[in-house]
Amino acid sequence: MQSGHYNRRQSRRQRISSNTTDSPRHTHGTRYRSTNWYTHPPQILSNSETLVAVQELLNSEMDQDSSSDASDDFPGYALHHSTYNGSEQNTSTSRHENRIFKLTEREANEEININTDAIDDEGEAEEGEAEEDAIDDEGEAEEGEAEEDAIDDEGEAEEGEAEEDAIDDEGEAEEGEAEEGEAEEGEAEEDAIDDEGEAEEDAAEEDAIDDEGEAEEDYFSVSQVCSRDADEVYFTLDPEISYSTDLRIAKVMEPAVSKELNVSKRCVEPVTLTGSMLAHNGFDESWFAMRECTRREYITVQGLYDPIHLRYQFDTSRMTPPQILRTIPALPNMTLGELLLIFPIEFMAQPISIERILVEDVFLDRRASSKTHKYGPRWNSVYALPYNAGKMYVQHIPGFYDVSLRAVGQGTAIWHHMILSTAACAISNRISHGDGLGFLLDAAIRISANCIFLGRNDNFGVGDPCWLEDHLAGLPREAVPDVLQVTQLVLPNRGPTVAIMRGFFGALAYWPELRIAISEPSTSLVRYATGHMELAEWFLFSRTHSLKPQFTPTEREMLASFFTLYVTLGGGMLNWICRATAMYLAAPYHSRSAYIAVCESLPYYYIPVNSDLLCDLEVLLLGEVDLPTVCESYATIAHELTGYEAVRTAATNFMIEFADCYKESETDLMVSAYLGAVLLLQRVLGHANLLLLLLSGAALYGGCSIYIPRGILDAYNTLMLAASPLYAHQTLTSFWKDRDDAMQTLGIRPTTDVLPKEQDRIVQASPIEMNFRFVGLETIYPREQPIPSVDLAENLMQYRNEILGLDWKSVAMHLLRKY
């Protein structure tokens, strides 16, 4: 079966076959590290100077050559930073000069946006010079060919070749490569190639040669573009391949088929399931036939690498300090060497340039921005997002994605103050990304042990009132490693650093250093899901406050459904992490067949997160809803749906990546996907916690009737207990107190009044693309039997300490007034 994410196998073969340089071998996978390192002394700017520089650059337009109008034909640009050659000490400013690469029209149509890294200027032949001379092309462009033949003795320059090296004493012009789009492992080879006149077989065809026949200065047309991963490593993108992350539908038992086919109709006989592809069940063709998969999820490269019109004029060559890896408390009897043999994370702990951190911060902000928000780097900033101080009006505005710009700005500022800025202040310059990696690994082992301890394996039938509660599934006894066999719940590790990383509603996913450290494609997947969830939370914060915590009836019903789905999704991710951890820590004599649920990618192409329970709930809760109409009328629901779809897609692709890397023995990329899933799980838990607190406020403080499926609060409580080493649950009373304190600090006052028309500025939020499709419209759950539901306010009283907090008596008074 063809893997959908980045066409990984093909791109790796291309990187291996095309690499002819002497660059040192990278420590993991088949990739190669760039030979460039930032060695020149730093120029340290103050925070205010940095912010001013970034703001000016964000608002400025990109410089363009007066002879070309690239903005009419090419929507995206990639920023190229020239860097030092490690063997030279040249301090010429041309080595730090930013160059902008112009994308071809074909690549722009394929939505391939790139962020190219520095190209080495190999200037050994010309000491102190790194300037490239753009020579006008003489001749006609021969479409579709990349001419690499030697220039004849008369010195006639053929079209498509940029002469970059000096002409030798005999007067022969050495040939300069013009393979537009081919960047080999981060190095655009611009040296002279031999003039034997033989054209290489693997030359990339020039799809878009400049119509005017001019090689414009400061631009370099490419047809085989390059991108980079988190460790300054190039990998090549082929324009002939569609770079999209798909959950493809292939015919069962024919994994080599890449054509999208429908799975056969589900069985008509009743089926009793004991769980979703448990380790001891094995694969059964009839199990796949139970569902008709008609949905395809995707992440386009445009969603992963947004173009950034930004050029830093200040020195950003500083690096983060060297990272120190330590043993983890969850495995006290294991030395660091033994730990790294099992979990090879040393390549993730390398220093990261400040420039990469700033760019990654802006990437996430662009992902989370919409028409109602301006973007800019926020994690390392000290200023608050723009908002209107004064009264906060939270009434719903009907219309086509209509929202109040005042309320959205205020809600975003409150969210930023409560979550992002507080987490950034606690983490920046105090905690290194090496400590973050150690925390994720330690927490993953602890929550896996808790999952096994709390997993019941009682095999409740589908439709049983407890079927939602029993969504944590333990492992068979023979598949549980000794280190995961515990007799009591494993508590979180102690210390202020751990407390910081467990808090703030799972804010570690917003930490740019940590996202970069886990390396691609995990960096892009976390950014993709986190950006959509962040935008949804902005709109959620703009709809309520302590004086008016109610939502509209439609919003309450939909948010209750999304809360149920997020809890189920989190349980599925926790089950997968538990099995992956057990496979890592299992003794060599353990049969790998016990961990087939994480070593085979086939199930995940059919069912998201390999959870039939999640697929059933999607149909039962959202199948009868007119989603396009609801999303057009409620921008909050629209972005909540988009966020859920993004999380489901990213989580499934983590699991596919892990299984594919296992088959290819890519141990470094396996642990990258493993830690990426742990990081995303923390953000999922934080978002589910936030949804419950908002719904609980509407039920207890606002007196609204909200109904949730029976057993979902039990499942939520079990999930939070198991994941407590990774995420610290926020209680209802502490959340609303912190929110009121944040509003007071920002000068925002809650009010129940209606926004005056003279202050009412209605804008349209960014419409969403309705790509959401259901898997298996005929559910395994009996459709004629409705899901039993309970009142949220009544059910909350069973969790006075766990969910409501210590001040639950004051909350109970509101419940008594309601009845």
Swiss-Prot record:
Motif Nuclear export signal extends across 785-807
Tell me which Gene Ontology terms the entry assigns under biological process: regulation of DNA-templated transcription
**Positions annotated as sequence repeat:** 117-132, 133-148, 149-164, 165-190, 191-206, 207-218
Record-linked InterPro entries: Herpes_UL47 (IPR005029)
Spell out the Basic and acidic residues composition-biased ranges.
94-109
Which species is this record about? Varicella-zoster virus (strain Dumas) (HHV-3)
Where is the region 6 X 16 AA approximate tandem repeats? Answer: 117-218
Subunit details? Interacts with US3 kinase. Interacts with ORF24 and ORF27; these interactions seem important for efficient virion nuclear egress. Interacts with ORF17/VHS. Interacts with ORF9.
What the protein does comes down to: Tegument protein that can bind to various RNA transcripts. Plays a role in the attenuation of selective viral and cellular mRNA degradation by modulating the activity of host shutoff RNase ORF17/VHS. Also plays a role in the primary envelopment of virions in the perinuclear space, probably by interacting with two nuclear egress proteins ORF24 and ORF27.
Recite the UniProt keywords alphabetically.
Host cytoplasm, Host nucleus, Late protein, Repeat, RNA-binding, Transcription, Transcription regulation, Virion, Virion tegument
Protein known as: Tegument protein UL47 homolog
Q: What is its main location?
A: virion
Motif Nuclear localization signal extends across 11-31
- Domain remarks in the Swiss-Prot or TrEMBL record: The nuclear export signal is CRM1-dependent.
Q: Where is the composition biased (Basic residues)?
A: 1-15
Sequence segments annotated as region (Disordered): 1-42, 58-221
Compositionally biased, Acidic residues: which spans? 62-72, 118-219
Q: Which GO terms describe its cellular component?
A: host cell cytoplasm; host cell nucleus; viral tegument
> In what ranges is there compositional bias, type Polar residues?
32-42, 82-93
The record describes its post-translational modification as: Phosphorylated by US3. This phosphorylation is required for proper nuclear localization.
Q: What Pfam families does this protein map onto? A: Herpes_UL47 (PF03362)
Write the lineage as a comma-separated list: Viruses, Duplodnaviria, Heunggongvirae, Peploviricota, Herviviricetes
Q: What else is known?
A: Expressed in late in the infection.
